[in-house]
Amino acid sequence: MEFDRILIRYGELSTKGKNRKQFVTRLAHNVKRAMKDLPEVRIHGERDRMYIILNGEDHKLAEERLKPIFGIQSFSPAVRVNLELDEVKNAALALVQDVHEQNGTFKVAARRSHREFPLDSNEINQEIGAYVLQNIEDLSVNVKNPDVKLTIDVRKEGVFLSCRTIIGAAGLPVGSSGRAMLMLSGGIDSPVAGYLAQKRGVEIEAVHFHSPPYTSEQAKQKAVDLAAKLAKYGGEVKMHIVPFTEIQEMIKQQIPESVIMTVTRRMMLKITDELRRKRNGLAIVNGESLGQVASQTLESMLAINAVTTTPIIRPVVSMDKNEIIQIAQKIDTYNLSVQPFEDCCTIFTPPSPKTKPKLDKIERYESFTDFDSLITKALDNIETITVNITENTQVKDEFADLF
């Protein structure tokens, strides 16, 4: 069966009252980005639903693109016919024939908002149901638990029919809750944190710290590939790759070994916060899980957070490793994350890092070195790319030089 459109039902948008229009607009924007390589697709957003007009594009590919988009409760491939009963009958029969199985059951659920159509909802149910039964053997009616539910929506602009409902990703449209910077390493936790933030409508821009020659091009590419996995939830992800070698070397030379990780994280957070300011972000997201490593104790978090007043969102803070791994496997980032390429969080790691660093001592150690000039240099040399779901590739950002 060739479908000419897809009907999208909204998720939590139904509770957003006066702000509903901006949520619908944002969802339409994300859907458009996800359909970037389907040029004939057209999107029509209405108050209670959205239509994707396929114009000959592959409906199966369009369905795959819609499945991970946050803000969609469910969607159905559909066909539109004119307000003629014979056309409705023929389309209904073709739809049910396409999906029914031997000795299957079905139900017709009609809704008529266009009052000039000659039949009311109950009459449509009876007329179409009888026609389908007459033309398909070994098919029976079950109104409570049917194998196939044929929905018919009679509107002024035509009659819309569908018989398959696909569950969407739910949540809020990415970008509807504002923008945040995701500190994206090559590990398991940070992609999961990014995914969970996106589910609540946060548009993430990934920040990855690259320290060649200590970290390889493969490690950098792994981070880009992880960003591509996250891009499918909103259509694309902007990624900032920060040259971090000089800062890490200076930390290793000037800072006591036991607090190297604390100072390293502080420098990362300073850079991320400055990027957030330039990119008009509202928060920073990271993959910290309380007590998992030395830099993720409450005392360490306190010392690290002291460099900023920006909200730090930690979606996985209360999860254990197994819970995080389960989500990573679900979103298809786990196999990438466990590839054995070192990132800047694992180089220069001391054998016995402090789990309860003192902020006053940390600040004193840092005061003997001009880290600010190194941070400025790193910010001036950031590489910014855009990672697209449709291409799974990277495009150098034309505005990167603004940093």
From Swiss-Prot:
Binding annotation for ATP: 183-184, 208-209, 265, 287, 296
Compartments where located: Cytoplasm
Keywords: ATP-binding, Cytoplasm, Nucleotide-binding, RNA-binding, Thiamine biosynthesis, Transferase, tRNA-binding
Record EC number: 2.8.1.4
Catalysed reaction, written as an equation: [ThiI sulfur-carrier protein]-S-sulfanyl-L-cysteine + a uridine in tRNA + 2 reduced [2Fe-2S]-[ferredoxin] + ATP + H(+) = [ThiI sulfur-carrier protein]-L-cysteine + a 4-thiouridine in tRNA + 2 oxidized [2Fe-2S]-[ferredoxin] + AMP + diphosphate; [ThiS sulfur-carrier protein]-C-terminal Gly-Gly-AMP + S-sulfanyl-L-cysteinyl-[cysteine desulfurase] + AH2 = [ThiS sulfur-carrier protein]-C-terminal-Gly-aminoethanethioate + L-cysteinyl-[cysteine desulfurase] + A + AMP + 2 H(+)
GO cellular component terms attached to this protein's record: cytosol
Principal location class: cytoplasm
Gene Ontology process terms (BP): thiamine biosynthetic process; thiamine diphosphate biosynthetic process; thiazole biosynthetic process; tRNA 4-thiouridine biosynthesis
Pathway annotation from the record: Cofactor biosynthesis; thiamine diphosphate biosynthesis
SUPFAM superfamilies given in the database record: Adenine nucleotide alpha hydrolases-like, THUMP domain-like
Coiled-coil residues: none
Ranges for domain THUMP: 60-165
An example molecular function term from Gene Ontology annotations: CCA tRNA nucleotidyltransferase activity
Pfam families the record matches: ThiI, ThiI_fer, THUMP
CDD domains in the cross-refs: PPase_ThiI, THUMP_ThiI
Family, as annotated: Belongs to the ThiI family.
Function: Catalyzes the ATP-dependent transfer of a sulfur to tRNA to produce 4-thiouridine in position 8 of tRNAs, which functions as a near-UV photosensor. Also catalyzes the transfer of sulfur to the sulfur carrier protein ThiS, forming ThiS-thiocarboxylate. This is a step in the synthesis of thiazole, in the thiamine biosynthesis pathway. The sulfur is donated as persulfide by IscS.
UniProt name for this protein: Probable tRNA sulfurtransferase
Organism of derivation: Listeria welshimeri serovar 6b (strain ATCC 35897 / DSM 20650 / CCUG 15529 / CIP 8149 / NCTC 11857 / SLCC 5334 / V8)
Lineage: Bacteria, Bacillati, Bacillota, Bacilli, Bacillales
Protein's gene: thiI
